[in-house]
Amino acid sequence: FVVTENHGEWLKVLLPVRPNGTQRWVHTSQVRTSTIQAHVAINLAERRLVATVDGTVIADTPVVIGAADTPTPTGRLFLTHYDEKSEGSAYGPWVAALSGFSQALDRFSGGVPVIAIHGTNNPAAVGQARSNGCIRIPNDVIRVLRDSLPLGTPVDIWP
């Protein structure tokens, strides 16, 4: 979860559910909190991702964004889990799943259309708008993110 407000013993947190941006109040006794000094910013207009840890840029790369009919959703999301894939897969070696979902698709690949940051088997597409809503990045960069960003890292996606 990402805490968005703190009122005494109550925390308002982002939830990994539809619709994107859903928040709920939880009592501090129900959760364990920690401070994460990592952040990812994705600028869709510039088609660029910048990731920082402790204020230091660890990745600054062009990206593939969602196509016109399957756009990448905007807003604050957070990193929920990593999935390892085979090196030559369409997703590259790692998928960094986020707390958001496609707003254009009801289902994807037999399941819910979770938005993710992942590698690619088509590096020539980097810089284009041609995904189903996910952010595709070079495989060497997704490895850096996997090794550096903890679960819960906030991800801000801007138009």
Predicted features by range, described:
Residues 6, 43-45:
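A short, compositionally biased micro-patch
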Residues 17-21, 55-59, 152:
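Short, surface-exposed beta-strand-loop junctions and turns on beta-sheet-rich folds
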Residues 48-49:
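Gly/Thr-rich phosphate-binding beta-strand-loop-beta motif of the actin/hexokinase/Hsp70
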Residues 2-3, 39-41:
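Short, surface-exposed charged micro-motifs
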Residues 30-38, 60, 67-78, 83-159:
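Exported/periplasmic cell-wall-interacting domains
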Residues 1, 62-63:
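Short, surface-exposed loop motifs enriched in S/T, G, D/E and P with embedded aromatic residues
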Residues 1-29:
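SH3/SH3-like beta-barrel superfamily modules
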